[in-house]
């Protein structure tokens, strides 16, 4: 079956001797996902029309009609009244057809000096620029929530882990600040990516530019671009800016996923460091006692989704010769879904972090296990003249003794410690036990980047200042 609308003629139909089949029409149409670009498409078209009038390529009356018609179309779209037509293929031709129906020949003059190739590239950049700014704001909200929680827990002691084994005591505030650093780098990547997004392709036309006396810099200024794409072939054909954004988004989600993994572990009754607010959890259809951390679990899963979009976009571009190819129609759905996934995740996590209930005693009890102050004992011996490797070996022997006895280093008396460490007994004094307390351990890491409560509060203050 073929389309009867072809009798009216598509924007390009005069070249062909038979109409497009309905199957091909459905296969090649993008309007039901690229209509998301409608408002930026109108914005770009208005800037283009203003330039055409300023350059006397179209008449002032045509510009006025275009502006009037676009205002009506924008209202129809915002009210949900616009009738999108599959037969008109994409967002651009749908809007142009409606404009022409409203204002006549002036609508047909709008496309002078441009192609859908540079038009869609402009639309995507305009849209993505706004979404980058939105995501930047959401990253700020998440970091603010983490900083609030870190400040409240600057002195809350928990075990630090390597290989998921207890390593050394840290503060919960210090642990959260690690994620503040990760998300801060993510924000920097978004800002840097925005610089390359914010270049105007319009004026490149199909691929070679246009013979009309256009003013690309004027359009760039009107639309808030930092400049123009310098090469017309590159302007219409590459989507590296979208790939770069998706790569930055994949890193955002990777950091979210790492945090999610810890939230799931911490909430487990076997660990019990935190509890998440009920509104971020679900129950079980069969087990009435269950409270499942579905939000962080789902965030881990959605990370794979964004990673997949990155691979999809890289694969999309890898085999394309210059200039524009229809392949690029497939750039939008991965890009749109990446934005939606990242934005929704960041918004939810900012709210979820603010609602975390911390269980300090459970954290402290866990930090007392696993000989977390063993390194402090080694440092104690080093400060009394013993080479570090010798101190390391001596403390390792003491740990083995305590493990056999089922006690901690701090549980040994001074006499027992000297007895078990005869080679260094002369270096061990009564003050050794102050080094084996959790508070003493974290307080001793009192340098920039360290876990001492004083440093945690200083880091929170610095991070807040950086957000302003």
Curated annotation (Swiss-Prot):
<keyword id="KW-0028">Amino-acid biosynthesis</keyword>
<dbReference type="GO" id="GO:0042450">
    <property type="term" value="P:arginine biosynthetic process via ornithine"/>
</dbReference>
<dbReference type="GO" id="GO:0005829">
    <property type="term" value="C:cytosol"/>
</dbReference>
<dbReference type="InterPro" id="IPR024083">
    <property type="entry name" value="Fumarase/histidase_N"/>
</dbReference>
<dbReference type="InterPro" id="IPR000362">
    <property type="entry name" value="Fumarate_lyase_fam"/>
</dbReference>
<keyword id="KW-0456">Lyase</keyword>
<keyword id="KW-0055">Arginine biosynthesis</keyword>
<protein>
    <recommendedName>
        <fullName>Argininosuccinate lyase</fullName>
        <ecNumber>4.3.2.1</ecNumber>
    </recommendedName>
</protein>
<dbReference type="InterPro" id="IPR008948">
    <property type="entry name" value="L-Aspartase-like"/>
</dbReference>
<comment type="pathway">
    <text>Amino-acid biosynthesis; L-arginine biosynthesis; L-arginine from L-ornithine and carbamoyl phosphate: step 3/3.</text>
</comment>
<dbReference type="GO" id="GO:0006526">
    <property type="term" value="P:L-arginine biosynthetic process"/>
</dbReference>
<dbReference type="Pfam" id="PF00206">
    <property type="entry name" value="Lyase_1"/>
</dbReference>
<dbReference type="InterPro" id="IPR022761">
    <property type="entry name" value="Fumarate_lyase_N"/>
</dbReference>
<dbReference type="InterPro" id="IPR009049">
    <property type="entry name" value="Argininosuccinate_lyase"/>
</dbReference>
<dbReference type="InterPro" id="IPR029419">
    <property type="entry name" value="Arg_succ_lyase_C"/>
</dbReference>
<dbReference type="Pfam" id="PF14698">
    <property type="entry name" value="ASL_C2"/>
</dbReference>
<comment type="similarity">
    <text>Belongs to the lyase 1 family. Argininosuccinate lyase subfamily.</text>
</comment>
<dbReference type="InterPro" id="IPR020557">
    <property type="entry name" value="Fumarate_lyase_CS"/>
</dbReference>
<dbReference type="GO" id="GO:0004056">
    <property type="term" value="F:argininosuccinate lyase activity"/>
</dbReference>
<keyword id="KW-0963">Cytoplasm</keyword>
């Amino acid at each position: 079956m073929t389309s009867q609308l072809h009798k009216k003629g598509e924007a390009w139909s005069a070249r062909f001797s038979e109409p497009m089949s309905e199957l091909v029409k459905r296969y090649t149409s993008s309007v039901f996902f690229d209509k998301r670009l409608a408002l930026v498409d109108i914005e770009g078209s208005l800037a283009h029309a203003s330039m055409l009038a300023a350059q006397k390529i179209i008449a002032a009356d045509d510009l006025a009609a275009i502006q009037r018609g676009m205002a009506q179309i924008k209202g129809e779209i915002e009210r949900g009244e616009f009738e999108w037509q599959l037969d008109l293929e994409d967002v651009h031709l749908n809007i142009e057809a409606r404009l022409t129906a409203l204002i006549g020949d002036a609508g047909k003059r709008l496309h002078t000096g441009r192609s859908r190739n540079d038009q869609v590239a402009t639309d995507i950049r305009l849209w993505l620029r706004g979404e980058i700014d939105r995501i930047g704001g959401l990253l700020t909200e998440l970091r603010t929530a983490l900083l609030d929680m870190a400040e409240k827990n600057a002195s809350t002691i928990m075990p630090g882990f390597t290989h998921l084994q207890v390593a050394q005591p840290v503060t919960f505030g210090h642990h959260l600040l690690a994620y503040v650093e990760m998300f801060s780098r993510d924000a920097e990547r978004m800002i840097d990516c925005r610089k390359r997004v914010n270049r105007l392709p319009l004026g490149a036309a199909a691929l070679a530019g246009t013979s009309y006396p256009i003013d690309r810099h004027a359009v760039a200024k009107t639309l808030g671009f930092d400049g123009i794409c310098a090469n017309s072939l590159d302007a219409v054909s590459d989507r590296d800016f979208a790939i770069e954004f998706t790569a930055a988004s994949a890193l955002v989600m990777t950091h979210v996923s790492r945090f999610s993994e810890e939230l799931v572990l911490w909430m487990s009754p076997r660990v019990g460091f935190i509890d998440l607010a009920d509104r971020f959890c679900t129950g079980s259809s069969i087990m009435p006692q269950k409270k499942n951390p579905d939000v962080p679990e789902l965030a881990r899963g959605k990370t794979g989704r964004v990673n997949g979009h990155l691979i999809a976009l890289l694969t999309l571009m890898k085999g394309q010769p210059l200039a524009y190819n229809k392949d690029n129609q497939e750039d939008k759905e991965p890009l749109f879904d990446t934005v939606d996934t990242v934005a929704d995740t960041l918004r939810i996590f900012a709210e979820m972090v603010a609602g975390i209930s911390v269980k300090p005693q459970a954290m402290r009890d866990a930090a007392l296990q696993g000989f977390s102050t063993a390194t402090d004992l080694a440092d104690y011996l080093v400060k009394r003249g013993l080479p570090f490797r010798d101190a390391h070996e001596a403390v390792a022997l003491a740990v083995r003794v305590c493990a056999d006895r089922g006690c901690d280093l701090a549980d040994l008396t001074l006499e027992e410690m000297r007895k078990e460490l005869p080679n260094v007994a002369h270096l061990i004094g009564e003050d050794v036990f102050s080094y084996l307390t959790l508070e003493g351990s974290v307080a001793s890491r009192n340098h920039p980047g360290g876990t001492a409560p004083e440093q945690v509060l200083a880091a929170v203050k610095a991070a807040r200042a950086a957000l302003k």
